[in-house]
Amino acid sequence: MRYEKPQRGRLREHLQLNCDIFGATGRSGEIEILQLITHLMKSFGATSEHFEVLINDREIVNTVFNELMKVDEETSYKLYKIIDRAKKVSPEALDKMINELSLEESSVKILKDYLGSKSFESLFSFLDSHGKLEMVSGFKELADIASKIGLSDYLVYDPTIVRGLDYYTGIVFEVFDKNPENRRALCGGGAYANLLKIFNENPVAGVGFGLGDVTLTDF
């Protein structure tokens, strides 16, 4: 149950399927979760014409904000909120929100170049041009593995996927319906390295996703 205004794809009462992997090393857990969600969608008869998995990595976003733009923690937090809303507002509204932060002109250019990176290739080219490609080698490894095992038909890099929850530390992703009449996220998730510290002083890394029955019914 959740207390909010009922609307298409969101009801107060709903069922949610959660799948998580704990303690996996390297990128293995992330790859397995991506395989699982893709296989789950395909088991419903969906193909790459029906859905896509939009993916990003919090380490990439942090690299852009902290290493390239060199903004402070408060501004970084505001930027996360702005990018999270990027798909829901007009380009003019997005520019207005960015301008209200009074960023340096060079930082605005870096941000817009980053937001213009809409494929794995363009992202890696952007980071390489700033000498930061090695800082996201793990994400490049994930993209390479995904390509080798046949996930590349479903995975799409999207710089605006950041997920609003602060506990994500690695990949973040959302499964999107490609139907123009229901262009929305069906489910989402990501990797979190420190969340379980609230239960155990020794952190256990996790990665997973949640899928609601309401959005799945509309698919």
Protein language model annotation of sequence segments:
Residues 43, 67-68:
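Charged, amphipathic alpha-helical linkers/stalks
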Residues 69-98, 151, 177-179:
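Acidic, His- and aromatic-enriched active-site or binding-groove loops in soluble protein domains
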Residues 54, 69-72, 87, 100-104, ...:
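Intrinsic-disorder-associated interaction segments
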Residues 36, 60-64, 93:
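A general alpha-helix detector
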